[in-house]
Amino acid sequence: MALTLEELVKRFGGEIAGDAQCKVSGLAPLDQAGPQQLAFLANPKYLSQVETTRAGAVLIAPKDLEKLRAATGGQAAGPLNFIVTPNPYAYFARVAQMFIDLATPPRAPGVHPSATIDPAAQVAASAVIGPHVTVEAGAVIEDGVQLDANVFIGRGTTIGAGSHLYPNASVYHGCKIGPRAIIHAGAVIGSDGFGFAPDFVGDGDARTGSWVKIPQVGGVTIGPDVEIGANTTIDRGAMADTVIDECVKIDNQVQIGHNCRIGAYTVIAGSAGIAGSTTIGRHCMIGGAAGIAGHVTLGDYVIITAKSGVSKSLPKAGIYTSAFPAVDHGEWNRSAALVRNLDKLRERIKALETALAAQGGTDA
């Protein structure tokens, strides 16, 4: 389906520079777009691609359009048509979602014959329940929810209106999923937190006893507009709920321990691990494979770079890193050798300082 720039601006805002009746039917990168496609410029370093793109129109920020016109002496360069908007990247995302929605026929509401719905569950008439879905007693499936094949919803759990759970996602008992959640395939919400009390006597080979499992009687509460990636796991609380606030975005294969609280608009990249009872503030960014210890607090607007380890609270906004970036193998070996010998070097320096002080060559 093709839409004019005028139709896009009526829906999403912005200003048109060029032909308002120019039609686009999809999106593509600047260097690959054709005359029927809309491209976008989010990074000024690619401004030169705007001059050569074949796109029918380009989403561009006002300052970048001014730079383009200055570079071409005010002459037309590249496409004649632009939608001028302060945030071309976000505009692109909204238009892309619209095209996907237009191209995806809505699924008819109803319950697949192979699904198992407990008589004590409440399922809205507008919900779409796919093959082999299980919904236990007391669960509430609100309006417009879509549960794909093999989804499991535990007893007493609520799935908020407009949410979409992809195949094989599981939400254990007693959890609350807010409206418009997106939970991708294989994610597990509400499994037991990692809680065990040591009950051992003696030392060494004479040690006896075992670990005593601590029942995890809390749940998981997830706010509106949260997205959870494939195979991510969010543990239920030991006593109170684990809480994921509104508009949090979590990537694939992330582990969030029991009793954590993740503040609104925070994003967490793939393979990050967050130990139990940790609080992360609003608008934080956690890089891929970062590890955060338990019982620490991160303030609002904290950024943790990829593969960093956080062992203490970071209340102040800022960028924090402890990762060792990749370097040439030989350079890494030399650096490692220096680290191994730091203690010896320290002792040699202390000895030199002592000798110099004894000779009066420097202050002690």
Swiss-Prot record:
Alphabetized Pfam families for the sequence: Hexapep, Hexapep_2, LpxD
InterPro entries assigned to the protein according to its UniProt record, in alphabetical order: Hexapep (IPR001451), Hexapep_transf_CS (IPR018357), LpxD (IPR007691), Trimer_LpxA-like_sf (IPR011004), UDP_GlcNAc_AcTrfase_non-rep (IPR020573)
EC number: 2.3.1.191
GO biological process: lipid A biosynthetic process
Biochemical pathway: Bacterial outer membrane biogenesis; LPS lipid A biosynthesis
SUPFAM superfamilies membership: Trimeric LpxA-like enzymes (SSF51161)
Annotated catalysed reactions: a UDP-3-O-[(3R)-3-hydroxyacyl]-alpha-D-glucosamine + a (3R)-hydroxyacyl-[ACP] = a UDP-2-N,3-O-bis[(3R)-3-hydroxyacyl]-alpha-D-glucosamine + holo-[ACP] + H(+)
Family matches, as PANTHER family: UDP-3-O-ACYLGLUCOSAMINE N-ACYLTRANSFERASE, UDP-3-O-ACYLGLUCOSAMINE N-ACYLTRANSFERASE 1, MITOCHONDRIAL-RELATED
Subunit details: Homotrimer.
Family of the protein in this entry: Belongs to the transferase hexapeptide repeat family. LpxD subfamily.
Name by which UniProt lists this protein: UDP-3-O-acylglucosamine N-acyltransferase
Organism: Burkholderia ambifaria (strain ATCC BAA-244 / DSM 16087 / CCUG 44356 / LMG 19182 / AMMD)
UniProt lineage: Bacteria, Pseudomonadati, Pseudomonadota, Betaproteobacteria, Burkholderiales
Encoding gene per record: lpxD
